Amino acid sequence: MLTTQLQAIKTGIAAAQARGLDVPAENALLFRTLLLVGRAVGTLADEAIRPSGLLEAEFRVLMQLYSRPDGVGHPGELCAGSAHSPANISRITDTLVARGLISRSASEQDRRRMILRVAAEGEELIRRFVPSAFRQIGTLFATLSAESRAQLLAQLDEIAAAYDQMTGDEPAC
């Protein structure tokens, strides 16, 4: 259980401090909690989409493409918005094309530029799996008020911005 694991983390941080380790307990707890909850939510997401037959990364790229105007995009856009390398986007889109979930064609304006489009089968898969997956995942947030959810989102945005500033992280594409 996550609550048991979080308690063990708190106990471990206190024990490390008692042994003389100079670590800010609150920062250590925030860091470890984010990691633990993030992994657990990722596992829940994997389980929710498993019946679709897609891996989480494939499903996320399909959803990202579906969420674009007219379900059309380019590999570079998918790369920038998904934190995947160009090579991984290529592999993922190859898989989605092979399964008939998206189509790939060359741009009429620039034959070197690929156009990716969600196919009817991809739209059907999304319409079939997304509502139930998000209902399942949504139960995690049901105990939070609308105000608490908005605050959590704002705080996560702040953490993401601080991370970007700290690392200078730019998309690989």
Please report, for each region that a protein language model flagged, where it lies by residue:
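N-terminal helix-turn-helix DNA-binding core of bacterial DNA-binding proteins
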Residues: A25, L35, R39-S85, T167, ...
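Alpha-helical hairpin
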Residues: V23-E26, L54-E56, V118, L144
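Alpha-helical linker/hinge and terminal dimerization helices associated
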Residues: V41, S82, L125, F129-L144, ...
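C-terminal regulatory/oligomerization modules of transcriptional regulators
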Residues: M1-D22, E147-C173
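Charged, amphipathic alpha-helical coiled-coil/dimerization segments
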Residues: D94-A154
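Short amphipathic alpha-helical segments with heptad-repeat character
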Residues: F31, L35, R39, A83, ...
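N-terminal leader segment of winged-helix/HTH proteins
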Residues: M1-S52
